[in-house]
Regions:
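Active-site-adjacent beta->alpha loops and helix N-cap segments on the catalytic face
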Residues: 85-95, 141, 156-161, 206-226, ...
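Catalytic beta/alpha-barrel core
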Residues: 80-85, 109-111, 131-135, 176-178, ...
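Glycine-rich phosphate-binding active-site loops on the catalytic face of alpha/beta enzymes
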Residues: 74-89, 256-268, 308-326, 362-396
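Bateman/CBS regulatory modules and CBS-like beta-alpha motifs in cytosolic regions of diverse proteins
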Residues: 27-51, 58-60, 89-129, 134-137, ...
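Alpha/beta catalytic cores of nucleotide-metabolism and tRNA/nucleoside-modifying enzymes
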Residues: 1-21, 109-112, 177-178, 184-188, ...
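Surface-exposed amphipathic alpha-helices with a cationic face
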Residues: 44-48, 73, 98, 121-125, ...
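Catalytic cores of alpha/beta
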Residues: 67-70, 244-254, 288, 293-312, ...
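Short beta-strand/loop segments at the ligand-binding rim of alpha/beta enzyme cores
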Residues: 48-57, 103-108, 171, 228-237, ...
Length: 501
């Protein structure tokens, strides 16, 4: 006989946080939102990767491209570049993020003295970088012979056939720094010499990296930005359970920091096989998350398979209709609470903490705080990020209001059957997502800043200043439908919508 859960499953809007004691030290500016992204052992000082804010962007065509990945990394979160595209184009997006940043940057634009002005212009048009390294062999780590920047040429007064050697700034006129130079020292050299870029070279004068003035300004404006050991932005990527043996190597070559198996249902043999292949091929050096699941059995299955984090949620996304078309899923709050308990039990038994990601069901900003209090280490958001300037879809006018297009990976538009296919030879013939619009909301920075201020403020109401304390000390109450109505405005007439004449 089928098992019946004794209680209905619930979602975030059915819960409220009960205030706790707020001390003088508990103010929003002192709240830390740092949280682990990947698993770690008890007693280990730091996970291999942590987030500075508990936000990640969904593995979706209409959400996570390289532009949004850069913007979110500046805030301290991470994007997972969508996998429903060719291996080459996904790897190219990852590479753009890794080359964009900051600190010590491997040169992405390189030529030889024998190249021409036309080559310089073509390279600039291709990758958007205005600084070109001139090396003996035209590679990023060749012997440095000069630099070409936009100040070195005027298209209107030169011929496309002019050789680079005739207008580049030669090596003897360049200020450089040795390999052991720290980022602070490099920035000091840049400011003292009024430079826009500083080449870092080895003992044989081969180019190693550039340090750019603009990146110093960016870091000062974004103190929580998420960087790797080379001061490049962190970026993730979604994979499927079919072409992973060719997709993963290409993504790693492009510099990806973390992977996630993108699937509507993660409690499957195919996810286990994918994780096992990663562990056999790369050991623990490659970080890979898995999901989605909605109960303790699904979590333990993926944790024991070797997942670095586990995503929680089926059918709760605003564009997801998996529950409607297939009748599977669970209320997001109930699923999250159960999986969080399973994660804590697994940690007690094995000494390994496997972070969980709440994926779906976030409608209002306060839902973020509820999800974290219920045990989520971080959140994955689709609709939320799809509204911003940096997202991949255009801003359009619909019925007098600016909107952005937003569609699910299970929709006909995405046709990402590898995400929803259970592994058989026959492709699915129905949709599990819709094609829609979301209200345009402006730049990512302004919106994330406002949302996280609400999270920090609410945490202070609870009486905590970090996420682990929130998960330990928060008190939550299930509310009735009448209480939900009571929580909004009621028994009044709004002046803005019903002006008094």
């Amino acid at each position: 006989m089928a098992y019946y859960y004794p209680e209905p499953s619930h979602t975030f809007s059915e819960y409220l946080l009960v205030p706790g004691y707020t001390s003088e030290e508990c103010i929003p500016d002192k709240v830390s939102l740092k949280t682990p992204l990947v698993k770690f052992r008890k007693g280990q000082e730091e996970p291999a990767i942590s987030l500075n804010i508990p936000l990640t962007s969904a593995v979706m065509q209409s959400v996570s491209n390289d532009t949004l990945a850069i913007a979110l990394a500046k805030e301290g979160g991470i994007s997972f570049i969508f996998g429903s595209q060719s291996i080459e184009s996904q790897a190219a997006m990852v590479a753009k993020v890794k080359h964009h940043k900051a600190g010590f940057v491997t040169s992405a634009s390189n030529l030889t003295p024998e190249n021409t002005l036309a080559d310089v212009l073509a390279l600039k048009a291709k990758n958007g970088f205005s600084t070109v390294a001139i090396t003996h062999d035209g590679t990023a780590n060749g012997k440095l012979l000069g630099i070409v920047s936009s100040r070195d040429y005027r298209v209107s007064r030169m011929e496309p056939t002019d050789k680079v050697s005739s207008f580049m700034t030669p090596r003897e006129k360049l200020v450089t720094a040795p390999a052991e130079t720290t980022l602070k020292e490099a920035n000091d050299i840049i400011w003292e010499n009024k430079l826009n870029s500083l080449p870092i070279v080895d003992e044989n004068d081969h180019l190693l990296y550039f340090v750019f003035r603009k990146d110093y300004s960016s870091h000062k404006a974004n103190p929580l930005e998420l960087l790797d050991s080379q001061k490049r932005y962190l970026v993730g990527a979604g994979i499927n359970t079919r072409d992973y043996e060719t997709r993963i190597p290409a993504l790693l070559e492009a510099g990806v920091d973390v992977l996630v198996i993108d699937s509507s249902e993660g409690y499957t043999c195919w996810q286990k096989k994918t994780i096992e292949w990663v562990r056999k091929t790369y050991g623990d050096t490659v970080k890979i998350g898995a999901g989605n699941v909605v109960d303790r059995d699904g979590f333990r299955f993926l944790a024991e398979a070797g997942a670095d984090f586990v995503k929680v949620g089926i059918g709760g996304g605003s564009i997801c209709i998996t529950r409607e078309t297939k009748g599977i899923g669970r209320g997001q709050a109930t699923a999250l609470i159960e999986v969080a308990a399973a994660r804590d039990q697994y940690f007690q038994e094995n000494g390994v903490y496997v972070p969980i990601c709440s994926d779906g069901g976030i409608v209002h900003d306060y839902h973020m705080t509820l999800a974290l209090a219920m045990g989520a280490d971080f959140l994955m958001l689709g609709r939320y990020f799809a509204r911003f300037d940096e997202g991949p879809t255009p801003k359009i006018m619909v019925n007098g209001a600016y909107m952005k297009e937003y569609w699910g990976e299970g929709s006909n538009r995405a046709r990402n059957w590898q995400r929803y296919d259970l592994g058989g030879a026959t492709k699915l013939s129905f949709e599990e997502g819709v094609d829609s619009y979301v209200t345009y909301a402006g730049p990512l920075h302004d919106n994330v800043e406002a949302s996280l201020y609400k999270v920090r403020s609410t945490m202070c109401n609870v009486g905590v200043t970090n996420i682990p304390d929130l998960q330990r000390d928060a008190k939550l109450t299930l509310v009735s439908s009448v209480s939900i109505v009571e929580g909004g405005y009621h028994d009044v007439t709004l002046r803005s919508s019903n002006p008094v004449k």
